[in-house]
């Protein structure tokens, strides 16, 4: 009951801050492995130090199609019950290039021995460059800049929460105070992303993680539904690791994706996904979308019966 009250309060707080929203952000299929890119409350949620790198080539073969390169560094400090993160992203769509760098902070509140609620905030700089073409002379940005480059930047802030226990539930409100310095290039309306997943063992060597998410955009929304099977390797009576995983993901009216990956070592893992466009895009994006991610953990151990590190520190301070 106490856990439900915490979650309900945070959800209501975030919903009340979200008014008008628009599609502005880069998209990654494998963000399920690195929520910190979209939610500051996820910084340090693996209770270790890690580096994540993503590279995405969308609609291969289509001129001006989007491409994205992104990454995070995050760590958890048990004495502070806090996670810290640094995220960056560079994506390109046609004549538009976007660059974003942020610092993220998350504070962890233990709820029992194996559940934790984190509250996060991130802030940074959003930069956008547009190479104007002849057909941009009527641009609402500034017609005098036609046939040239226009650059702009703004400060940017995100707010989020994440509950991690028998299931994972999170939400983030993005672009809380995004105002362009000179032009209208970097002005972002607020957007919100909510997600839910739960992982459970089917056998000693196999586990399943169903997941769902909703991304709200201006006057519409997009849902994601998927599942990932993890094939496990037992290290000892108390620890295990993922040997490899296979999964599938469906985005309503947008695409269908397959995901696969493996642990190259106990600290390094590699993942790949392929998105096949459906609906109106299927006729022009026949080659699909390819995405790779690489992660490196300095000190992560997977426990079968893990006690939350935030709870351990909470007990120590009593």
Feature locations, PLM:
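Positively charged n-region of N-terminal signal peptides that target proteins for export
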Residues: 1-6, 111-113
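Subset of outer-membrane beta-barrel
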Residues: 23-318
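Sec-dependent N-terminal signal peptides
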Residues: 6-16
């Amino acid at each position: 009951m106490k856990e439900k009250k915490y979650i309900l309060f945070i959800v209501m707080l975030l919903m009340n801050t979200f008014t008008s929203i628009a599609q502005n952000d880069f998209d990654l299929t494998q963000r399920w492995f690195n929520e910190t890119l979209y939610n500051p409350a996820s910084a340090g949620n693996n209770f270790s130090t890690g580096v994540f790198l993503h590279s995405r080539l969308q609609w291969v073969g289509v001129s001006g199609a989007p491409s994205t390169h992104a990454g995070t560094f995050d760590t958890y400090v048990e004495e502070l019950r806090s996670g810290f993160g640094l995220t960056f992203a560079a994506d390109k769509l046609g004549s538009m290039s976007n660059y974003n760098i942020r610092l993220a902070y998350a504070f962890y509140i233990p709820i029992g021995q194996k559940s934790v609620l984190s509250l996060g905030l991130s802030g940074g700089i959003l930069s956008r460059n547009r190479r104007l073409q002849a057909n941009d002379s009527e641009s609402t940005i500034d017609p005098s800049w036609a046939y040239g480059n226009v650059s702009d930047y703004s400060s940017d802030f995100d707010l989020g929460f994440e509950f991690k226990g028998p299931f994972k539930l999170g939400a983030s409100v993005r672009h809380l105070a995004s105002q362009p310095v000179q032009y209208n290039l970097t002005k972002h309306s607020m957007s919100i992303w909510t997600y839910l997943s739960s992982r459970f063992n089917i056998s000693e060597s196999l586990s399943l993680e169903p997941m769902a998410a909703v991304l709200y955009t201006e006057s519409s929304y997009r849902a994601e539904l998927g599942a990932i099977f993890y094939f496990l390797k037992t290290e000892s009576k108390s620890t295990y690791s993922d040997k490899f995983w296979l999964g599938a993901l469906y985005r309503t009216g947008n695409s269908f994706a397959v995901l696969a990956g493996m642990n190259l070592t106990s600290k390094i893992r590699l993942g790949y996904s392929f998105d096949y466009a459906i609906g109106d895009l299927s006729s022009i994006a026949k080659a699909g979308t390819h995405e790779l991610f690489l992660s490196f953990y300095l000190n992560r151990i997977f426990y079968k019966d893990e006690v939350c590190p935030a709870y351990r520190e909470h007990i120590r301070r009593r």
